[in-house]
Amino acid sequence: MARGIFITATGTDIGKTYVTALIIKRLRETNINCGYYKAALSGAERRDGKLIAGDANYVYNIANIKGDPNDAVSYIFQQAVSPHLAAKLNNVEISMERIKKDFYSIKNKYDYITVEGSGGIVCPISTGKERIMLHNIIKIFKLPAIVVADAGLGTINSTILTLQYMKEKNISVKMILLNNYNHKDIIHIENKGYLSDNLLIPVYTCNKNANNLEIPVEKLIEIYEEI
């Protein structure tokens, strides 16, 4: 049976894709068959008439996953807006059945599957015939989660609010990862210390522009759960 994890964040442009790529890369470098999936992607580039799922393309390149990155994303939109708005603008009805079908198809190819969210944890995926929020996808696949947060000013507030929302939705959070971390920045140091001291969740860091995660592979493997 495959094992999975969901990567979400405290907001948009925090570094989910970057962290997701490094996690998958770390596992694949130890010969763990780890794949990638994303339900909806906005802000895709158009090349030669074809939309390119930029986030998936980045992950595939960094983690050395073979195949077409577009196959790892159910819905790809050009407009850089929330998925539900992109779907409206393109007259597309987002379906949970399609998301489930695509997810299980990819899951069957890998021993480990890393699912990346869109935006922050409170993200509308569809407001059409089906009303789908990001947390609905996490719940239907029974995935635990990693929360990616920026290491800088304001992260205590945004991280704790994100965790509170996830607690209300009964989503298990296995790890907090502070991105763009600077070991010499007093704010970053204090933020990590405060979160570590006040939460019952492990807090790790990822240095800015790092090529690898410093998290032990064993710790990453532990947080993936059977799905």
From Swiss-Prot:
UniProt keyword Membrane present: no
Subcellular location: Cytoplasm
Cofactors named for this entry: Mg(2+)
Xref: Gene3D superfamilies: P-loop containing nucleotide triphosphate hydrolases
GO MF term set: ATP binding; dethiobiotin synthase activity; magnesium ion binding
Domain of life from the UniProt record: Bacteria
InterPro entries assigned to the protein according to its UniProt record, in alphabetical order: DTB_synth_BioD, P-loop_NTPase
Residues bound to Mg(2+): 17, 55, 116
Biological or metabolic pathway of the protein: Cofactor biosynthesis; biotin biosynthesis; biotin from 7,8-diaminononanoate: step 1/2
Statement: the UniProt record of this protein carries the keyword Nucleotide-binding: yes
EC code: 6.3.3.3
SUPFAM superfamilies, per database record: P-loop containing nucleoside triphosphate hydrolases
Annotated GO biological process: biotin biosynthetic process
Residues that bind ATP: 13-18, 55, 116-119, 179-180
One GO cellular component, as annotated: cytosol
Binding-site residues, substrate: 42
Enzyme class: ligase
Reactions it catalyzes: (7R,8S)-7,8-diammoniononanoate + CO2 + ATP = (4R,5S)-dethiobiotin + ADP + phosphate + 3 H(+)
Signal peptide coordinates: none
Family recorded in the similarity comment: Belongs to the dethiobiotin synthetase family.
Assembly behavior: Homodimer.
Function of the protein: Catalyzes a mechanistically unusual reaction, the ATP-dependent insertion of CO2 between the N7 and N8 nitrogen atoms of 7,8-diaminopelargonic acid (DAPA, also called 7,8-diammoniononanoate) to form a ureido ring.
Stored NCBIfam families: bioD
Protein name: ATP-dependent dethiobiotin synthetase BioD
Organism: Clostridium botulinum (strain Hall / ATCC 3502 / NCTC 13319 / Type A)
